[in-house]
Amino acid sequence: MKKANDRQSPPKLLEKKRAKAPEQPTPPIQEEPEPVSNVLQGDDILALAIKKEDLTKQHIPQFEETGEKPVVTQKFIIRKLKPKDSCKRVYHLVAHPANPDATTKPLDYSGPRDSFLSSDQILPHQILGSLQDFKRIAVARGNTQLAKLINIQPCLMTLISAKEEPKPKSPKEEKRPPWAPPLQHNFLKNWRRHITLRKKQQEVLSEHLKKPASELLMNSGEGYRKIQEEREAIDRALPTQHDRKAMNCFWSPLEYLGDEKSGLLMTKKKKQRGLVEPITHIRKPFSIQMETGLPVQKDAWYRYTWDRSLFLIYRRKGLQNIMAELDFSQQDIDGLEVVGHGKPFSSVTVEEPLPLEKSQKSSSEDTVFLDSLTNLSDMVPMPILGPSLLFCGKPACWIRGSNPEDKKNIGIGVRLTFETLEGEKTSSELTVVNNGTVAIWYDWRRRPQQDFFQDLKQNRTQRFYFNNREGVILPGETKHFTFFFKSRNAGIFMESWEFGTHPTLLGGAALQITLHAISLTQDIFMDERKLLESKLAAHEAVTIAQSVLQDLLRGVSTPERAPSPVDAYLTEEDLFHYRNPRLHYQHRVVQNLHQLWQQYTEAKASQEEALNLRTPTVPLLFVEKPPDHSRTLASEYPQLQPHQEMDTLKDPKNSLLPQKTGISTKSMQRKSIMEEILVEEGPDRENTRSPRVLENLPPPKWNLCLEDFRQAVMTFPEELQREDALIQLNKAAMELCQEQKPLQSDLLYQMCLQLWRDVIDSLVSQSLWLRSLLGLPEKETVYLDIPDEGQKSPPVTEVKVTSGKLGKEDRRGGAQEKKQLSARDKEEKKGSKTPSKEDRLNSKKQKAKDDKKVVKSTSRDRLLSEDPPADSSATSQEPIDPLVMEKYTQRLYSEVYGLLDNLVIDMMVLADELGSEKNVEEPLRFCT
């Protein structure tokens, strides 16, 4: 029954429900549900048990496949769209972000490798060099497969040798016709093409954005240049007004790049110095604006731009006169247009003269009629009753009752201007329209023109060409008269023609056409001329500079430099070489000979005094030895007179001894001086001296001649003394015969010595600084003048020196003098036991005899005999705080440790560097 009821139609069910609805007056009573217990019973527990059958249904066991799997094929239907037509495709460029791994990959510069074989041909950008050279090398190496991939144009195959491939015939270049435009005119085509694309782009954007083209963002900066020029003009005019803005940069000081002592001084710019360049005006003419599709449109009134501010308007009015003076080249750029250089040019200019007073006397009807015709011509182009023409846009009408005197005047003047190069042709048109109702007959009449150079013109060549035959212009017809100009010669040419009409228009006033042409010379040698002018200008500048410099040098007269005395640089070594040309000078050996000479001369003098014997001796030449053996003073030797110098220079044959090899012309002068010394110190002069004078003179010194030394030794009376002297003399001569080879200086020793000196200097400076900082008393120094041998020591002067003025050189000198004085004391004690040490000490003493010696206050114990000043004793007795002294010593110890640490590090670094260099270089050897 339920199934039967379910199959009944929906309308029947609705009717039954409506019929049963009134039979249910009360809703059924809801029974309360019985409480359900949460405790599971035994049946429920058994029902929850898991059976194996249920598990097998859920998890089907997978058996291993013993045979091959059955192939199951399925068919799918795929819907493919038809490709669109290629002509309707639109390509868009989409920018995608770069691959992040692209930057990490190293660039491959190994070349194309095998990419040639995969492609059909090799492109020029795939190789370095030209394709011709690449193919030639490939063919030479026998790689024909690679050579086939190179496709070269036939005109470039001529570079390949004839043995490899036959030479193809290169096509002949076709000559361009003379009337063809030059290739430089292609930029006009590109300009027009780009302008067309720009116009299309503007139209699309303006339609899409619903904005005019002038308000687009791409055209928003058209007026920015004008605003910048106006700002610059106002900024230049503001310094003239006293409104707190002036050219502060003009009065500002110069800037430094870095420090004022070691930096660079920055010069001012031209603008800061007042040298301002004129304002350059850049605009777009009206023709260019129309060509680019930018009509001149004014901004809306509600746009409050910079140039519309009230402050700017008042500022313009206040600076109007000054801006006009500063920027006086304001031109109407809207009317300018670039025609081109050397391009034929033509223009038409119409001039309508003012009405004369005589024409005003004509009837009022004619005047009213003429005005009405003019107004009609300006408003609506409608035909005019009677004869009338539009001559180049100007109305020329028939006037009744014309005055015969008006025929002398010009009614309408037309000027046609031509400009072209010589030999080229240009043209211009003249338009005449018959806007009346009457046919007008016309003819051309050439007007006479006054020529001021008739004698110079030999032939009259025609240069203007046009159709000058008469004709008729029908009503409503338009005539175009084309005028051509061509001239073989450069110059300015002019012709005047009159356009005659019948009936006569404008009361007989002439319709004049003036042809004005300019023919320019083509400058063929412009580049060569400019190059020549630049060379001449440079040559002129160099010539002028040289002439000015020569004039200045001639005007400057510098006095000649006083020649230094030729004998000012004679040293002991030079005298020794002159006396003994075959021997080599050694300072130690020569000093030993000096001591030996002094020793034997003193012994001989004592013997002579004891015996009172007068025996004839060999005359000797004695030369006073200067305090410093390294040089001889000019006062020791007599100066040569000018005439004697000239004689010695002119006659070099007067030299007594042969010259030594390698001696220059200066040695000639030295030898002549030595000859003078020989003459003045000769035996005759010694004999002329009186005995009293000889007694008062000090003992003679050795004249550095070994032969004289030997002769003097031979005069000794005792044979033992003579033999001993000869042995020592022969020993010294043997040493002097050997040439002394100087060794290379020890670089490491010198550098370490310099570092040690720097450490000592820095230590002394730190000590002085600590003393001044802690308030300790200043130390004293004593200056001592050490006299020469045989002289009495002058009194010692003790001077107090402040720590700030104590220099490094004084401290070094004090330390060195300490060593010399101690060595000298030891020498006096030892005597002649150690001759080698005496030689070294004597050499040191000879180098520093004339210098002042500085000794510390600790050396005053040796000078107790002298009277010290009172101030020194007072300062030495001042009490010193032990705490301050302890602090001073601690600080000084720390400084010493730091300085010594740095010294050791520097020495190690230098030793390592020099050691690495010595490993590469050769070992030290004697200089040959």
Curated annotation (Swiss-Prot):
Its main location: cytoplasm. Expressed in brain, retina, testis, heart and lung. Not detected in liver, kidney or intestine. In brain, highly abundant in CNS neurons of the hippocampus and cerebellum. Strongly expressed in cochlea and vestibular sensory epithelia. In both the organ of Corti and the vestibular organ, expression is restricted to hair cells. Residues 1-38, 164-183, 786-881 are annotated as: Disordered. GO terms for biological process: cell differentiation; chemical synaptic transmission; endocytosis; spermatogenesis. The modification Phosphoserine is found at S557, S564. May play a role in spermatogenesis. May be involved in synaptic processes. This is MYCBP-associated protein. The lineage of its organism: Eukaryota, Metazoa, Chordata, Craniata, Vertebrata.
